[in-house]
Swiss-Prot record:
GO terms for biological process: translation. SUPFAM superfamilies: L21p-like. This is Large ribosomal subunit protein bL21. It comes from Salmonella paratyphi A (strain AKU_12601). The keyword Mitochondrion does not apply. The keyword RNA-binding applies. This protein binds to 23S rRNA in the presence of protein L20. GO terms for molecular function: rRNA binding; structural constituent of ribosome. The gene is rplU. It comes from the Bacteria.
Length: 103
C-alpha cells in the first residue's frame, strides 16, 4: 500500500514505515501529525485518485528529527571587473516516519 500526498508545495510518494524528508514543519520532535492533502491511495489493484484530494484520506506520521541540509554556494562573478560575490544557504528540513495510511 502506498499513497501520494503534498506538503510544503511538493508531492511525496510514501508507504508505511518509510522515513521522508519534508520542508520544515513547526512541530516538536516525537509528536504525531496528520496530512489530509492526500492526492492518491493505492492498495494492490484498488486505486483511489482524488479530485484534487481523496475524501477521508489521511496519512499519519511521527516527527523524527529537525535539521539543516548541506550548504549550497551561490557565486556571482563579473570578468575583468574585480567583482566576486559568494553566498551560502542551508535549508531547514523535518524528517517524519509514516505510521499509517487510511482512506
Amino acid at each position: 500500500m502506498y499513497a501520494v500526498f503534498q506538503s510544503g508545495g511538493k508531492q511525496h510518494r510514501v508507504s508505511e514505515g518509510q522515513t521522508v524528508r519534508l520542508e520544515k514543519l513547526d512541530i516538536a520532535t516525537g509528536e504525531t501529525i496528520e496530512f489530509a492533502e492526500v492526492l492518491m491511495i493505492a492498495n494492490g489493484e484498488e486505486v483511489k485518485i482524488g479530485i484534487p484530494f481523496v475524501d477521508g484520506g489521511v496519512i499519519k506520521a511521527e516527527v523524527v528529527a529537525h535539521g539543516r541540509g548541506e550548504k549550497v554556494k551561490i557565486v556571482k562573478f563579473r570578468r575583468r571587473k574585480h567583482y566576486r560575490k559568494q553566498q551560502g544557504h542551508r535549508q531547514w528540513f523535518t524528517d517524519v516516519k509514516i505510521t499509517g495510511i487510511s482512506a
